Amino acid sequence: DVCRECGVPPGVVNLLSGDPPSIASQLISSDIIKKISITGSSRVGKLILKQAADKVQRVTMELSGHSPFIVFDDADIKKATDMAIAAKFRNNGQVCISPNRFYIQENKKDEFVNLFIEKTKKLKIGDGMDPSVQLGPLTTKKRLNEVEELVETTKKEGAKVLLGGKRPKGFNKGYFYEPTVFDNVKDD
């Protein structure tokens, strides 16, 4: 709708959601597709390369990045937290460029973390179609299970949950999960 409102002709922008391997297979095998560009995991990259090799398809890949968010001691902490929240929670962090790690210089850590948590607590969880909502559900049950498993593993490895770490109260339908902030996460 937004694209049409901005004058973009129908068919120029198309969003596909569903089973990534089957979608990729259909796109790669199509004679219409002339170039493939992907940002994703090494596993998915290998699958796409194998499929693209049959057609000698042009491919560009950015694989297995960890999108660090770095804050130095000369940073404007208010601006840094605003940018961090926008980057991290866009589409519930389900974007390949969403920061996975935050590296904060020690003398700014407490100030950054406290303000980041304060602002994150104000994010509204709910129906993603509601304009007042900042955080909708995760995309699939599988993704929800992966997030729950990741949180449990991270806690077992000694990280401390500073915020979230569970499904929000009152959201029994859908794949909702609270924004979660850890401290003392292992470097690997």
Q: Which stretches of residues belong to each language-model region?
A:
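PLP-dependent aminotransferase-like
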Residues: 1-24
